[in-house]
């Protein structure tokens, strides 16, 4: 296990005490809000640090008691009984503190752009893409997040060939970022008379929603084209050109949006373009740290098959962490916290292992 950064822990405690004192001194409303934000950010780790210091002090007292020949038998027996429990508590607190002190992903607190595209499997793949979108939509509803569809191309038999949406709320990206990759489904299509199991797939991409401050797009770097917009099946064709296609000339990225309002379409398309460019920057930075990427959950490659949904067996398998659960019906209703938590725990464990390697 990696060693605890004692100096950093002391600095956090010192800063926490300073914030408490300044908040008690009655600062202005603006200053108080900033202090309260930093206080709430530091409080979880400082409370663990203080619990760790208390437990290590207790352990030191027990060690001194056991080393003292003058300690009577009853006290020695009690100390030997308590020692393993306190050692276990110290070890658990060490790991909790290390996790809390891991470098934060700057994008974790952001909202996200969710993109789902039907892959191999024709109509069944489009239906599965629709099922995945509803799964994430229900998960978001349970978290109090807001989902807004930016663009959608419906499948001929239902579902979606492609759907792009924003998922807005605090910490959305931190919970959904491990969903990127190929999701494979095995089930009997409703149109399959022989009862044969078909395999199809959909690709999910989760991007942190970028703000103007994150990425600068120069007007001379984009080309905006307007087109006629149509509804599902070609119906409700607008009489004006409202669909917008934006091409980012330096990268060749193309984004379209086809709602009724041209102004809204341009804003939505720019929102997606900004997030894709921001994601490209993050991917580039990650590839420069390629030596570390072996320690992350999967490779982050969106062509990587990450998960299989087997409907006949009610089984879900996440191939990155060898997780298998048999409650697929509940998963499809949006109950994916168990999977997300397992992926996050695996990621944190790998980061701790990497930290330990660097210290050795």
UniProtKB/Swiss-Prot annotation:
Basic and acidic residues bias (residue ranges): 281-307
Name under which the protein is recorded: Peptide chain release factor 1
Positions where N5-methylglutamine occurs in the chain: 235
Keyword Protein biosynthesis: yes
Record keyword Oxidoreductase present: no
Recorded GO MF terms: translation release factor activity, codon specific
Organism: Sinorhizobium medicae (strain WSM419) (Ensifer medicae)
Source domain of life: Bacteria
Subcellular localization: Cytoplasm
SMART domains linked: PCRF
Region of interest (Disordered), ranges: 281-310
């Amino acid at each position: 296990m990696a060693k605890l950064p004692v100096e950093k822990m002391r600095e956090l405690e010192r800063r926490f005490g300073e914030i408490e004192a300044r908040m008690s001194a009655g600062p202005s409303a603006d200053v108080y809000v900033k202090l309260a934000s930093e206080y709430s950010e530091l409080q979880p780790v400082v409370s663990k640090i203080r619990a760790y210091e208390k437990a290590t002090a207790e352990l030191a007292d027990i060690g001194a008691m056991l080393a003292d020949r003058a300690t009577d038998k009853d006290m020695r027996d009690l100390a030997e009984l308590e020692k393993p429990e306190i050692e276990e508590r110290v070890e658990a607190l060490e790991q909790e503190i290390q996790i809390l002190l891991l470098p934060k992903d700057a994008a974790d607190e952001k909202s996200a752009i969710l993109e789902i595209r039907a892959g191999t499997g024709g109509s069944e793949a489009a239906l599965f893409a629709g099922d995945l979108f509803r799964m994430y939509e229900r998960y978001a509803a349970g978290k109090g997040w807001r989902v807004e569809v930016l663009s959608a191309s419906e499948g001929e038999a239902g579902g979606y060939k492609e759907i792009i949406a924003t998922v807005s709320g605090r910490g959305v990206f931190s919970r959904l970022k491990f969903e990127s990759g190929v999701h494979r489904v095995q089930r009997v299509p409703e149109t399959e008379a022989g009862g044969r199991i078909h395999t199809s797939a959909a690709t999910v991409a989760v991007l942190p929603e970028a703000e103007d401050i994150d990425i600068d797009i120069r007007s001379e770097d984009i080309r905006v084209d307007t087109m006629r917009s149509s509804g599902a099946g070609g119906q409700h064709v607008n009489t004006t050109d409202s669909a917008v296609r934006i091409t980012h000339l330096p990268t060749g990225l193309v984004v379209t949006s086809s709602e009724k309002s041209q102004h809204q379409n341009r804003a939505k398309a720019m929102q997606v373009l900004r997030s894709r460019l921001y994601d490209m920057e993050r991917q580039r930075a990650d590839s420069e740290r390629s030596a570390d990427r072996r320690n992350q959950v999967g490779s982050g490659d969106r062509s990587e098959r990450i998960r299989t949904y087997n409907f006949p067996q009610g089984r879900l398998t996440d191939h990155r962490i060898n997780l298998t659960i048999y409650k697929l019906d509940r998963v499809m209703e949006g109950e994916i916290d168990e999977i997300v938590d397992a992926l996050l725990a695996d990621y944190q464990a790998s980061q701790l292992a990497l930290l330990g390697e660097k210290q050795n």
